Amino acid sequence: MFTQFYRIWRKYSYPATFETGGSDATSQCLLGLIGLGIPGTAQQIATPVSRFLALLSVMRLPTRNAEGISALVTLLAPNTHARVTPHWPQKVALTQPASLSTTHPVSLSQGTPLGSAGFDANSQLHLALFTEDTKEARGWLPGNQLHKDLLVLLRVYLGWRCTAKLQLSLPIHSLPEPVLGGGPVLLGMTGVLGLGSEAWQVGEHDTITINLGRYQGLHSNPQYRETQHVTYRF
C-alpha cells in the first residue's frame, strides 16, 4: 500500500519539484530524451532550455515534420496560424556553370542546368504565418522578440542543413496609417501609402504578405588568402 502511494506521489509531484529553467532532476531526464540533457547544452542555445519541455512530443520524433514546426509557432504565439510547405525551391549559385568549353565539356542529355544558377527543392521549406493579433504581428517583424525566438527554436529543431523561407500575412486594416506622429511604420513591410484615406477602401478580408527573411543554419564563410608566391607557366 505504501509503495503504491509512493508511486502516485512520484507521478504527480513533478510540478511541485520543478525548478526555474528546468534544472531539477526530472526535467533534466526529460530533456535527455530529446538530446538536450547533456551538460553545457543550455549555454549553446540562446533561449531557456525549459521551453522545450512543452515540445517533448514533437522533439522526440526521429524526423522533422510540419506539425513540429507549427508547434514551435503555437508555443511562441498562440494566436498565429502556421502553414508549412515542404520542398520550396530556392536559387543556388553554380560553382561551375555550363559553357562551351573543351576543358569541361557538358552534355544536355544529362539534365545539365543552363545559366549561372539552379533551383534546389530538397533542403528548404516555406513557413507562412497569419495572425490578426496586432501585438503578435509586431513581434514577428525582423528584429523583434518573436522573430528572434523563432529563429533560435528552428535552429534547434531543424538543425544546420535545412533552410526556411519565412512570410507573414496580415489583414490590411490592422496596419498603422502612414502619418507623422502615428504608429511605427516600416518601409517595405508595414508602410502602405494611402492607407486610411477615403480613396482607398480596404475590404474586410484583404491581406498583405510581408517577407520576414530566411532561416539558414549554415552560412557561407569564404576565406580569401593573399597569394604571395606565384609561378607563371608560359
Residue ranges and their predicted role:
Residues Y6-L76, T80-T103:
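Feature for intrinsically disordered/low-complexity regulatory segments and propeptides
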Residues A71, L75-F234:
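C-terminal structured domains
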Residues M1-F5:
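Long, hydrophobic/aromatic-enriched structural stretches that serve as scaffold segments
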